[in-house]
UniProtKB/Swiss-Prot annotation:
Disulfide bonds: none annotated. The lineage of its organism: Eukaryota, Metazoa, Chordata, Craniata, Vertebrata. Keywords: Apoptosis, Cytoplasm. This is Fas apoptotic inhibitory molecule 1. It is found in: Cytoplasm.
Length: 201
């Protein structure tokens, strides 16, 4: 079983039963939030067969059979930006194993902490659809449900506005100074002249 800060989230009742039947050696599941969406990473480790299988969003990325060395690592890529991910397999005692996930060379926990400083995320419902809007603060790229949006920047009296459209809805992210050095710039999503609360991660 997995342990540590980067331990997986185990299968819940919402997952289809057929995927559990198919994945008989499923040992770890992680949900990873990237700019283009939340990706589910599943790992099968057959400690008697030597099998290792990595699935990203239900699609098989890596399959290795008859691996005689049961510890090691598997490296693959996740999401539209091809973010590097590595699953580390370590023996902790006897036939017990620990599975940890690294994203861009950092533990999942450290990566998510860093990401919360470099991105803002909003979730809202528009026209009966759930939308996930992500602002990458370092590049000012805006993503909506996995698509990088066409944007137009505009300077205004109290800061900047980054405009984009979702369907027939006018949206913009307003950036204003907090006036406090430690807080920095405050980003606010406005959709149809309505402020959307930020998702806290």
């Amino acid at each position: 079983m997995a342990s540590g800060d980067d331990s997986p989230i185990f299968e819940d009742d919402e997952s289809p039963l057929c995927s559990l039947e198919k994945m008989t050696d499923l040992v770890a599941v992680w949900d990873v939030a990237l700019s283009d969406g939340v990706h589910k990473i599943e790992f099968e480790h057959g400690t008697t067969s030597g099998k290792r299988v990595v699935y990203v969003d239900g699609k098989e990325e890596i399959r290795r059979e008859w691996m005689f060395k049961l510890v090691g690592k598997e490296t693959f890529f996740v999401g539209a930006a091809k973010t590097k991910a590595t699953i580390n397999i370590d023996a902790i005692s006897g036939f017990a194993y620990e599975y940890t996930l690294e994203i861009d060379g950092k533990s999942l926990k450290k990566y998510m902490e860093n990401r919360s400083k470099t991105t803002n995320t909003w979730v809202l419902h528009l026209d009966g659809e759930e939308l996930r809007v992500v602002l990458e603060k370092d590049t000012m790229d805006v993503w909506c449900n996995g698509q990088r949006m066409e944007t137009a920047g505009e300077f205004v009296d109290d800061g900047t506005e980054t405009h984009f459209s979702v369907g027939n809805h006018d949206c913009y992210i307003k950036a204003v100074s907090s006036g406090k050095r430690r807080e920095g710039i405050i980003h606010t999503l406005i959709v149809d002249n309505r402020e959307i609360p930020e998702l806290t991660q």
